[in-house]
Amino acid sequence: MMMIYLSLSLGLLIFSSSNKHLLVTLLSFEFLILLLFSLLVYSNYMSMINAFIFLSVTVCEGALGLSVLVSLVRSSGSDQVQFLNE
């Protein structure tokens, strides 16, 4: 259980400090979602159908994030967040 909390704090640290590239931010966000899922499953808080719904929504969120990343790279040529202000 302590390992999950340590990973959660590390994931939050990476998410808050990664402000240059959108890909690193999306990967750290997915890492946090998977840690939240493992925490909920470990504590027996979710039933099996709720776990599948949670994972389905997470996959849809990841696909939308990747589509935003691809459109950003096609329009600006880079995944750096500083190009979003232009």
Swiss-Prot record:
Compartments reported by the entry: Mitochondrion membrane
Domain of life: Eukaryota
Entry keyword Translocase: yes
MF terms (GO), sorted A to Z: NADH dehydrogenase (ubiquinone) activity
Transmembrane segments: 22-42, 52-72
GO cellular component terms given for this protein: mitochondrial membrane
Primary location recorded for the protein, binned into one broad class: mitochondrion
Membrane topology, from the record: Multi-pass membrane protein
UniProt xrefs under Pfam families: Oxidored_q2 (PF00420)
Catalyzed reactions: a ubiquinone + NADH + 5 H(+)(in) = a ubiquinol + NAD(+) + 4 H(+)(out)
Enzyme class: translocase
Recorded family membership: Belongs to the complex I subunit 4L family.
Its job: Core subunit of the mitochondrial membrane respiratory chain NADH dehydrogenase (Complex I) that is believed to belong to the minimal assembly required for catalysis. Complex I functions in the transfer of electrons from NADH to the respiratory chain. The immediate electron acceptor for the enzyme is believed to be ubiquinone.
Protein name: NADH-ubiquinone oxidoreductase chain 4L
Taxonomy of the source species: Eukaryota, Metazoa, Ecdysozoa, Arthropoda, Crustacea
